[in-house]
């Protein structure tokens, strides 16, 4: 059924973990005739990324409050009210039938403005621990979804919306069927890279010796330094890039992934069907570690928390994984995947606007 006159405003920004899932839901609704517009901030990645996907974007001025000085905190109430008023102006101009909050600072003012105007709010929490913005918005949202158990007590667990090129990868047993020789390791630290991975992996690869290939996504402005670190460690064959444009192709190539455990990364690893060693980013609420827990528990992944990370420990963990174990991990990852989150969230939006 087509919904040619229906409009959605997506509210998401800051990181790919918020923006890419929002784009996946938007694409589902566009295929059913919906018009999509975005609410974001002008100085974060959505400003450049969203228009590349053919979606117009409006901007508000808003920043986070965590870790700010006293003057910022004193000004915060006025800045929040101003951001809500800015969001309200954009909502009045666009007149959406619903708004979708995917997290990031922009979701708070946008969601409150929509609620005050009587526009239905649908919320999706990507992490196993709900962010402050989504904790607030969950109290006023018409529907709330979570990617992993634990963010909310009674919200449906639907996984994270994942890009279709990742979902459509061949099954692990097909990809691994003809592989022999060097084990392929893919290192990913997110769009900004991960300093701890950049510092540790060259020494790990040197210690592993022959029998391994590596592709390493170093992050913004780190490619040269990381490439030089591999060369200094005697690892001449490392392929180091700043950013990976075709993530699906990289997952398809890999036998093993070594990475952070941001929400979208964990969901993509599972959807792709690749075994992983997660090195969670250190945070007081252990958000990234909790994101990865379910894949570790089912045997699809291993985890080393950052305080426990050493060259020796990671080297030993990689050495212990042979091809049979890597295939088993990949299969368990794919079996644990929830592949229809974008469809479930899109259908909920359609249902509340009928």
Curated annotation (Swiss-Prot):
Keyword Amino-acid biosynthesis carried by entry: no
Similarity comment text for this entry: Belongs to the glycosyltransferase 28 family. MurG subfamily.
UniProt: UDP-N-acetyl-alpha-D-glucosamine binding residues: 15-17, 127, 163, 191, 244, 263-268, 288
Catalytic activity, EC: 2.4.1.227
GO biological process: carbohydrate metabolic process; cell division; cell wall organization; lipid glycosylation; peptidoglycan biosynthetic process; regulation of cell shape
Chief location of this protein within or outside the cell: membrane
GO molecular function, one term: undecaprenyldiphospho-muramoylpentapeptide beta-N-acetylglucosaminyltransferase activity
Alphabetized UniProt keyword annotations: Cell cycle, Cell division, Cell inner membrane, Cell membrane, Cell shape, Cell wall biogenesis/degradation, Glycosyltransferase, Membrane, Peptidoglycan synthesis, Transferase
HAMAP family, A to Z: MurG (MF_00033)
Taxonomic placement: Bacteria, Pseudomonadati, Pseudomonadota, Gammaproteobacteria, Vibrionales
Stored InterPro entries: GlcNAc_MurG (IPR006009), Glyco_trans_28_C (IPR007235), GlycoTrans_28_N (IPR004276)
CDD domains, alphabetized: GT28_MurG (cd03785)
Top-level EC class: transferase
Function comment: Cell wall formation. Catalyzes the transfer of a GlcNAc subunit on undecaprenyl-pyrophosphoryl-MurNAc-pentapeptide (lipid intermediate I) to form undecaprenyl-pyrophosphoryl-MurNAc-(pentapeptide)GlcNAc (lipid intermediate II).
Protein name as it appears in the record: UDP-N-acetylglucosamine--N-acetylmuramyl-(pentapeptide) pyrophosphoryl-undecaprenol N-acetylglucosamine transferase
Catalytic activity: di-trans,octa-cis-undecaprenyl diphospho-N-acetyl-alpha-D-muramoyl-L-alanyl-D-glutamyl-meso-2,6-diaminopimeloyl-D-alanyl-D-alanine + UDP-N-acetyl-alpha-D-glucosamine = di-trans,octa-cis-undecaprenyl diphospho-[N-acetyl-alpha-D-glucosaminyl-(1->4)]-N-acetyl-alpha-D-muramoyl-L-alanyl-D-glutamyl-meso-2,6-diaminopimeloyl-D-alanyl-D-alanine + UDP + H(+)
Membrane topology (UniProt): Peripheral membrane protein
